[in-house]
């Protein structure tokens, strides 16, 4: 395996090159600072961009790391010249050299919700568009979170100012507040990509794995929410239960098996909004005549979800996460399984819900759920909670008759 890396004298390269070399990859390093390359990596072939043709022979993939980063000074033109103009030249050289694969290190800043906020973000979004329009190679676009390894840079560098014993804990806390990416995980992803050359766009983060700061805060929010609702709104729960019982035949609370974390089934509790003996199917598969009169109001106001505080207390669900589906929704289950969505607990509300993506489009829903997992942070959890509370997302819709 032979990988040509641009921007090889930069921070991200310095954190992943040891992992790539330890895995047996042969590296060709390119940078404007050739002296730094030869000083740090004397065992690797290296040169500047003018030496590309002589260095590119036998290369399997190009990893384009060269960029003007978001902590650098400069105007829009300066960022565009480096992050788009240089990429265009690298793409041309890659094609000319007959290299079959290009791996582009983009950024979470290039996502649509942030791309208008800085010259860096705008240039990274333009770079992705350039590749989508002009790259005919096997193309991997990786939107990276803040990368960390044996060293820290950017906003994470604040950790290095504290005593060594407390640094790991602070790094976990910062990771709970914004997505981060361990260098080893990035290196492993690159190695897998070179072994499997195909086109893909992917968000790369640690996904809050092994982050006790995020896990404890998220679980704490679940328990506080469940306890608050139970203590303050027990009377509303009792009134709604009685109203459902009196206005239609059937139980007040509907207990239904759903697919939970790791694909394990659990019983999900909701106020019944459907008529008795309605078939077990996704809401989008049912007609609106299946919904009771009071059920329409409960679904619109989301009050039907209140009994799910039981699931929060039991740990079956979280306040925020992918909405749990039925065991019969095989297409959605398999799509979620393939994207790792089943690795986390399902939620009462989620990113897909406030985006109005429901179970009628299983592949799109699974992809959106996977994006949520990659982007998870405490601020995002709070953003989804606020959006849900203010009326965003109305859940799965029934079919018109």
Describe each model-derived feature in a short phrase.
Residues 285-344:
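A short, structured surface patch at a secondary-structure boundary
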Residues 43-85, 89, 93, 109-113:
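NAD(P)H-binding glycine-rich loop region in Rossmannoid oxidoreductase-like domains
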Residues 3-23:
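N-terminal Rossmann NAD(P)H-binding glycine-rich loop of SDR-like oxidoreductase domains
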Residues 132-152, 199:
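Conserved beta-loop-beta element that borders a ligand/cofactor-binding pocket
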């Amino acid at each position: 395996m032979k990988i040509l890396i641009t921007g090889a004298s930069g921070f991200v390269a310095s954190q992943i090159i040891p992992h790539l070399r330890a895995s047996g990859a042969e590296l060709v390093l390119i940078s404007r600072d050739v002296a730094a390359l030869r000083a740090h990596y004397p065992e690797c072939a290296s040169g500047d961009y003018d030496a590309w043709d002589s260095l590119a022979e036998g290369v399997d993939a190009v990893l384009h790391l060269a960029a003007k980063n978001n902590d650098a000074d400069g105007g829009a033109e300066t960022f565009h010249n480096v992050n788009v103009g240089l990429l265009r030249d690298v793409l041309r050289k890659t094609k000319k050299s007959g290299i079959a694969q290009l791996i582009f290190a983009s950024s979470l800043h290039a996502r649509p919700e942030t791309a208008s906020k800085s010259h860096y973000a705008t240039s990274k979004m333009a770079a992705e568009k350039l590749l989508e329009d002009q790259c005919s190679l096997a193309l991997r676009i990786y939107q990276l979170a803040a990368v960390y390894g044996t060293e820290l840079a950017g906003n994470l560098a604040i950790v290095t100012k504290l005593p060594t014993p407390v640094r790991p804990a602070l790094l976990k806390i910062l990771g709970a507040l914004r997505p981060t990416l361990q260098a080893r995980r990035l290196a492993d992803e690159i190695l897998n990509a070179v072994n499997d050359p195909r086109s893909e766009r992917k968000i790369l983060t640690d996904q809050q794995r092994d982050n006790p700061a995020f896990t404890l805060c998220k679980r704490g929010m679940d328990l506080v929410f469940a306890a608050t609702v139970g203590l303050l709104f027990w009377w509303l729960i009792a009134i709604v239960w009685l109203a459902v019982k009196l206005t239609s035949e059937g139980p007040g609370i509907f207990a239904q098996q759903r697919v939970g974390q790791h694909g394990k089934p659990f019983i999900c509790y909701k106020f019944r909004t459907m008529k008795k003996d309605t078939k077990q199917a996704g809401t989008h598969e049912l007609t609106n005549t299946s919904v009771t009169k009071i059920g329409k109001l409960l679904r619109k106001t989301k009050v039907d979800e209140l009994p799910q505080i039981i699931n929060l207390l039991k740990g079956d669900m979280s306040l925020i996460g992918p909405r749990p589906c039925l065991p019969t929704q095989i297409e959605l289950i398999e799509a979620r399984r393939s994207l790792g969505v089943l690795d986390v607990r399902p939620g009462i509300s989620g990113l897909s819900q406030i985006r109005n993506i429901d179970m009628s489009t299983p592949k799109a829903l699974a992809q959106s759920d996977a994006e949520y997992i990659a982007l998870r942070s405490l601020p995002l959890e709070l953003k989804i909670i606020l959006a849900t509370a203010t009326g965003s997302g109305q859940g799965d819709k029934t079919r018109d008759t």
